[in-house]
Amino acid sequence: MACEQHEGCYELEEREEIEDIKDSDTKWVSITQAAKLHNVTRQAIYVAIKQKKLKASKETRWEIDIKDLEEYKRNRYSRKKSLYQGELVFDNGKGCYSINQVAQILGIPVQKVYYATRTGTIRGERKGAAWVIHVSEIERYKNEYLSKQAAKKLKGAEPKEHQAPNFEPPTEIFPESN
């Protein structure tokens, strides 16, 4: 019984300490404080620093800016900052896109893009666990496969008088999103 009460007191003290950190006017926190704030281990914070996912400086001890810590928390699971061997996995500036981005660009279901990559219709490369598809491959797939499928659909829906279809492919395949 005494142990349970002691554990409860410890948790209460820890919560008060976390609230003190949040309420104080300090701009910098230590690895230990950052770990307590985000309910993770010190090792997890250290690994994030080493992987350059969390900015920190070390003069005598590691110090992390509160703003950087909050940004890390917001982008912790974001694939926009995913790194593979030190490089961005989905670097849109270099023309590398994720499966979801390709599906959105082409206006087709995500599963169709996965199927196309598995069958080799769209050539993509694996970076770790992620599929990365280059912009030239997106263009090729759009021109070779999607335009043929659209033509087949229109041909099947065309009346017997053989009227010309009113089909215009999209002029811009990459919507501006930054």
Swiss-Prot record:
InterPro entries named among the record's database cross-references: HTH_17
Organism superkingdom: Bacteria
Stretch list, region Disordered: 152-178
Pfam families: HTH_17 (PF12728)
Membership in a protein family: Belongs to the EUO family.
Protein name: Uncharacterized protein CPn_0561/CP_0189/CPj0561/CpB0583
